[in-house]
Design a protein with these regions (language model features):
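Basic, helix-initiating cap at the start of DNA-binding domains
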Residues: 1-31, 35-47, 60-64
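Short coil/turn segments at alpha/beta junctions that flank glycine-rich nucleotide-binding fingerprints
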Residues: 30-34, 85, 106
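Short hydrophobic/aromatic patch on the recognition helix
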Residues: 46-56
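Alpha-helical DNA-contacting segments of helix-turn-helix folds
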Residues: 61-70, 113
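Hydrophobic alpha-helical connector segments
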Residues: 65, 79-105, 150, 158-162, ...
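Amphipathic alpha-helical packing segments from all-alpha helical-bundle domains
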Residues: 72-75, 122-147, 156-160, 171, ...
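Short secondary-structure transition hinges
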Residues: 94, 101-140, 152-153, 171, ...
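Amphipathic C-terminal alpha-helical segment
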Residues: 101-105, 109, 141, 159-180, ...
Length: 207
C-alpha cells in the first residue's frame, strides 16, 4: 500500500512573523533579554535561526518587534474601549479596565515590557518609553476633547499622572501585596482617586 505524503502548509511571511513574535515574547519573558538566545526562539517556533534573522535582523530587532506589537495591541484595546463610552467617566473607566485586562491576558508580554533592567541600552529602552508616550498622547487627546478650556499643558500633565498611576498600580499587582487585586478592583481604585478631581473640574467649568 502506497502512503500519500500530505504537503506541509506554507505560512505567509506575516503568519511566520507572528509565530516568531509569539515565541520570542515567551522566551524573553522567561529568561530575560540577555539570557535568551535566538536558538531558543528558533527551536520554539520550529524553524532555523536564519529564518529569525531574515525577519528581524538581530536579537534586538526581534525584541523591538515584540514591543512594537504590544504597543499596537495596547492602543487598539484601550481606544476601542474608550470609543464605546457614552460619557467622560465611562470613557476613563472602560479605558482603565481594558488596560488591566490586556496586561492580565498577555502576561508574557507584560513581563517583557516591564523588565526594564533586562532591556539593552538605547533602542530597546527607547521603544518601551514610546509605549508610555503613545498612551499619554492618547489619553491627553481624550481629555482635551472633554475639557478644551483646560489648555494643552494642563491636559498633558493630567495624562502623565494617569499613565504613571496605571503603570505603578500594574506593577504593584505583580507583587505579593497586590496580587489578589482584580482588574475590576484596580480600575475602581484608580477611579476613586482620579475621577474626583476631573469631575470637580467639569462641574466648575459647567461641562
Amino acid at each position: 500500500m502506497t502512503s500519500v505524503n500530505t504537503p506541509r502548509r506554507r505560512f505567509t511571511r506575516a503568519e511566520r512573523a507572528r509565530q516568531i513574535l509569539d515565541a520570542a515574547v515567551e522566551v524573553f519573558a522567561e529568561r530575560g533579554f540577555h539570557a535568551a538566545s535566538m536558538d531558543a526562539v528558533a527551536e520554539r517556533v520550529g524553524v532555523t535561526k536564519p529564518v529569525l534573522y531574515d525577519h528581524f535582523g538581530s536579537k534586538e530587532g526581534l525584541l523591538l518587534g515584540c514591543v512594537a506589537r504590544a504597543r499596537e495591541e495596547l492602543l487598539e484595546v484601550t481606544s476601542s474601549a474608550a470609543a464605546a463610552a457614552t460619557n467622560p467617566e465611562e470613557m476613563l473607566r472602560l479605558g482603565f479596565r481594558a488596560f488591566f485586562d490586556y496586561l492580565d491576558s498577555h502576561s508574557p508580554a507584560w513581563n517583557l515590557l516591564y523588565q526594564e533592567a533586562s532591556l539593552p541600552n538605547g533602542a530597546g529602552a527607547d521603544s518601551l518609553e514610546s509605549i508610555r508616550a503613545q498612551q499619554t498622547d492618547f489619553i491627553a487627546a481624550l481629555l482635551a476633547a472633554q475639557a478644551p478650556e483646560a489648555g494643552p499643558a494642563r491636559v498633558q500633565a493630567w495624562a502623565q499622572v494617569i499613565v504613571g498611576a496605571c503603570e505603578r498600580l500594574a506593577l504593584w499587582r505583580r507583587g505579593s501585596a497586590g496580587a489578589q487585586v482584580s482588574a475590576e478592583q484596580a480600575t475602581e481604585y484608580l477611579m476613586d482617586l482620579l475621577w474626583t478631581g476631573l469631575a470637580n473640574r467639569q462641574d466648575e467649568s459647567g461641562a
